[in-house]
Amino acid sequence: MIDIHCHILPAMDDGAGDSADSIEMARAAVRQGIRTIIATPHHNNGVYKNEPAAVREAADQLNKRLIKEDIPLHVLPGQEIRIYGEVEQDLAKRQLLSLNDTKYILIEFPFDHVPRYAEQLFYDLQLKGYIPVIAHPERNREIRENPSLLYHLVEKGAASQITSGSLAGIFGKQLKAFSLRLVEANLIHFVASDAHNVKTRNFHTQEALYVLEKEFGSELPYMLTENAELLLRNQTIFRQPPQPVKRRKLFGFF
């Protein structure tokens, strides 16, 4: 299994603090059935800047350590890029990393809103052959209040990744319920851990897949995990036609 969003590289952001933490996370990932991780340290979020060369070097060093420790896990380079207006230009300058050098780019919104220029930026990126993958949209306040924002971005070609912990209920029942509504509306294309450590931000991969199978049957979790394989091969992912999210006041978000 492939995890496309994880903060396993040591001392690069708010994820693994050192190489010992990285090894501990690697062992936890393997226990969850994960064999490949795309390391996605935060980049340009106002706190962290992790340049491509540094990410590649850190991934190489961690892979050497994993071999030494006999841990059956391989780490690939990527970034979780906080959205900003010059993403397209900086990709052209090779100043940003896509996910393992594929056409897929992991883009993070601020947690409280969706920038108004996002739609135009995503359009421009797609003209250049890239596919923006929206990181954890379920945790964005404006999307929770107005999920049609996500619907319109997905309708126009973006993909999105939900966090395993959200589906597993780690962030609360309301966020779990909202996450399931996004899945139900065909607005989610990947499940990933966004793991930062093994104590407070663990993988929860198997829990999430269990929830998905219980709610929607076995075909959906298979499709979402297969999409990670397709991404890694730089191929077109599976998609179902997106639908508007059902408005249920029960969830407390709208």
UniProtKB/Swiss-Prot annotation:
Its cofactor is Mn(2+). Changing H5A: Large decrease in activity. InterPro entries: Caps_polysacc_synth_CpsB/CapC, Pol/histidinol_Pase-like. Keywords: Hydrolase, Manganese, Protein phosphatase. It holds the Pfam family CpsB_CapC. It comes from the Bacteria. Signal peptide: none annotated. It catalyses: O-phospho-L-tyrosyl-[protein] + H2O = L-tyrosyl-[protein] + phosphate. Changing H42A: Large decrease in activity. GO terms for molecular function: manganese ion binding; protein tyrosine phosphatase activity. SUPFAM superfamilies: PHP domain-like. Its EC number is 3.1.3.48. It is an enzyme of class 3 (hydrolase). Inhibited by vanadate and sodium pyrophosphate. Not inhibited by sodium fluoride. Belongs to the metallo-dependent hydrolases superfamily. CpsB/CapC family. Dephosphorylates the phosphotyrosine-containing proteins YwqD, YwqF and Ssb. This is Tyrosine-protein phosphatase YwqE. The gene is ywqE.
